[in-house]
Curated annotation (Swiss-Prot):
Native organism taxonomy: Eukaryota, Metazoa, Chordata, Craniata, Vertebrata
Similarity field: Belongs to the crotamine-myotoxin family.
Species of the source: Crotalus durissus terrificus (South American rattlesnake)
Subcellular location: Secreted
Molecular function (Gene Ontology), one example: potassium channel regulator activity
Protein name: Myotoxin-1
Length: 65
């Protein structure tokens, strides 16, 4: 019975996180996953697909200074 409780807790925590937070490689670079059609205008950085889902790319907004 304890195994079922542990399994339920693990599944609950696994589905609790937001989908946008699942793409660690992109977020480590300071970016977010955007539709591929979006153009990253300088001073933004376009990191390409990285670990973003299908038809999306990693883009970091520039500082705008």
């Amino acid at each position: 019975m304890k195994i079922l409780y542990l399994l339920f807790a693990f599944l609950f925590l696994a589905f609790l996180s937001e989908p946008g937070n699942a793409y660690k490689r992109c977020h480590i670079k300071g970016g977010h996953c955007f539709p591929k059609e979006k153009i990253c205008i300088p001073p933004s950085s376009d990191f390409g697909k990285m670990d973003c889902p299908w038809r999306r790319k990693c883009c970091k907004k520039g500082s705008g200074k």
